[in-house]
Curated annotation (Swiss-Prot):
This is NAD kinase. It is found in: Cytoplasm. Gene3D superfamilies: Probable inorganic polyphosphate/atp-NAD kinase, domain 1, Probable inorganic polyphosphate/atp-NAD kinase, domain 2. Involved in the regulation of the intracellular balance of NAD and NADP, and is a key enzyme in the biosynthesis of NADP. Catalyzes specifically the phosphorylation on 2'-hydroxyl of the adenosine moiety of NAD to yield NADP. The lineage of its organism: Bacteria, Bacillati, Bacillota, Bacilli, Bacillales. It catalyses: NAD(+) + ATP = ADP + NADP(+) + H(+). Keywords: ATP-binding, Cytoplasm, Kinase, NAD, NADP, Nucleotide-binding, Transferase. GO terms for cellular component: cytoplasm. Belongs to the NAD kinase family.
Length: 269
């Protein structure tokens, strides 16, 4: 089994990485950061997001597993004291692969049809560069839906619906549903300007095209990465064809994670 380990960079996570590497020498495991079969993230959800983007070019060939050295995360499901058990599981069993939907966004520029494509595991946001009111036309399936005015828009995946989307009042969506969700960020609603005022959940075959009005410099965030785009014509969002693959060695139910993170954990009862 070819593996690689990425850490948060703190002393606790780095020490755990070295412990795992030494333990893996007793097994038929080869450290290979160029072509791993399994990527082990040590830290938290932020570390796993970084690992996802580092290996987003080979998602069909790699599976991710997370070890959390801080707070309980939605992606990191193993604890530091369980690493030896995890290594044994990796070597002794055929692990189950769970696939989650991803978000695709294509930024189209006014420069001779030039465009760039990105994938997001959690969400992508769209705002102006300087924090002024974002004015955009929202088109769904090729039809004009609304003209949005506000701070911005957040487009999330089902697994990312528990993150920024939840703080915006969006719905929590089970990752088995191939969908994306559009949530408003401080929309302007009065007698003159109106938006739908509710999160929208779009299925896989629906495409959302957002076109800036009177400004062509847009700042997007793609998970933890912030990017400034100049001369933007439009940004297209849809459920990606690719999926992220997680290695599962034991049950890790989505709704239990939601309960433990936002209501109470088992050890608090």
């Amino acid at each position: 089994m070819r593996y690689t380990i990425l850490t948060k960079g703190d002393s606790k996570s780095n020490a755990l990485k070295h412990k795992m590497i030494n333990h893996m020498k007793d097994f038929q495991m080869v450290e290979d950061s160029e072509n791993p079969e399994i990527v082990i993230s040590v830290g938290g959800d932020g570390t796993l997001l970084q690992a996802f983007h580092q290996y987003s070019h080979m998602l069909s060939k790699v599976a991710f597993v997370g070890i959390h050295t801080g707070h309980l995360g939605f992606y990191a499901d193993w604890l530091p004291h369980e690493v030896e058990k995890l290594i044994i599981e990796i070597n002794n069993s055929e692990f189950q692969v769970i696939e989650y939907p991803l978000l695709e966004l294509i930024v189209r520029y006014n420069d001779n049809g030039y465009e760039t494509r990105y994938l997001a595991l959690n969400e992508a946001t769209m705002k102006t560069e300087n924090g002024s009111t974002l004015v955009v036309d929202v088109n769904i399936r090729g039809k004009h839906f609304e003209r949005f005015r506000g701070d911005g828009l957040c487009i999330s995946t089902p697994s990312g619906s528990t993150a920024y989307n939840k703080a915006l009042g969006g719905a929590l969506i089970h990752p088995s549903l191939e969908a994306m969700q559009i949530a408003e960020i401080a929309s302007i609603n009065n007698r003159v300007f109106r938006t739908v005022g509710s999160p929208l959940v779009l299925p896989k075959h629906h495409t959302c095209l957002i076109t800036p009005v009177n400004h062509d410099t847009i700042r997007t965030t793609i998970d933890h990465v912030s990017i400034k785009h100049k001369n933007v014509n439009a940004i297209q969002y849809r459920v990606a064809n690719e999926k992220v693959r997680f290695a599962r060695f034991r049950p890790f139910p989505f709704w239990k994670r939601v309960h433990d993170s936002f209501i109470s954990s088992d050890d608090e009862r």
